Amino acid sequence: MQELAPRQQQVLAFITGFIAENGYPPTLREIAAHLKISGTLGVSKHLEALERKGYLRREANSSRGIALVGRTDTALSLPVAGVVRAGLPQPAVEDIEEYFAIDRSMVRGGTFFLRVKGDSMINAAIVEGDLALVRPQATAENRDIVVAMVDGEATLKRFYRQRDQIRLQPENPNMDPIIIRPGEGDVAIIGKVVGIYRPLE
């Protein structure tokens, strides 16, 4: 199947999650309301693209005439599990905001998305609003971009271990690193960032 644009991925993920929860597909108005698309014409254009690319088929003269095609082999809907700060640490948000469709080959068990807030990672081409694909793991190698909990608060930074201390380095020259020395704080690696996705709308 052809690759999807970010907005098409969002539409497909919402349809998939809606069907899983309700047992039937959403209407065009429900899709428009959830994704804040102005009017059903915009939704129709996204559905036409998804149908053309082989992800769904549509039935004429039916308000819920959407059927998914070939989902088990190619795509998976992952939760956007909240917000992580690319800046100063902040309390983690763990409510499921939405679902986002991604190629199954990119996913290992437990992988999830977090929405980026802040600009501390701009030199790594990670900006506010991006979706960070996070693979859960408790360890990291130097230079890995990680989601870490620092004294119970979440942050997204580049990881370095230096002798007996850990440095969480921003990719913004205007921001200082977070240094965790023995006995001065608690840090835990939540996962490694393995991909960045940027909605275009």
From Swiss-Prot:
Catalysed reactions, as listed in the record: Hydrolysis of Ala-|-Gly bond in repressor LexA
A molecular function GO annotation: DNA-binding transcription repressor activity
Gene3D superfamilies in alphabetical order: Umud Fragment, subunit A, Winged helix-like DNA-binding domain superfamily/Winged helix DNA-binding domain
InterPro entries: LexA, LexA-like, LexA/Signal_pep-like_sf, LexA_DNA-bd_dom, LexA_repressor, Peptidase_S24_LexA, Peptidase_S24_S26A/B/C, WH-like_DNA-bd_sf
GO cellular component, one term: protein-DNA complex
Domain of life: Bacteria
GO biological process: DNA repair; DNA replication; negative regulation of DNA-templated transcription; proteolysis; SOS response
EC number(s) stated in the UniProt entry for this protein: 3.4.21.88
Keyword line: Autocatalytic cleavage, DNA damage, DNA repair, DNA replication, DNA-binding, Hydrolase, Repressor, SOS response, Transcription, Transcription regulation
Site (Cleavage): A86, G87
Keyword flag Translocase: no
DNA-binding region range list: 28-48
Active site: S120 (for autocatalytic cleavage activity), K157 (for autocatalytic cleavage activity)
Assembly behavior: Homodimer.
Family in the record: Belongs to the peptidase S24 family.
Stated role: Represses a number of genes involved in the response to DNA damage (SOS response), including recA and lexA. In the presence of single-stranded DNA, RecA interacts with LexA causing an autocatalytic cleavage which disrupts the DNA-binding part of LexA, leading to derepression of the SOS regulon and eventually DNA repair.
PANTHER family: LEXA REPRESSOR, LEXA REPRESSOR-RELATED
Protein name (database record): LexA repressor 1
Species this protein is from: Geobacter sulfurreducens (strain ATCC 51573 / DSM 12127 / PCA)
Gene that specifies this protein: lexA1
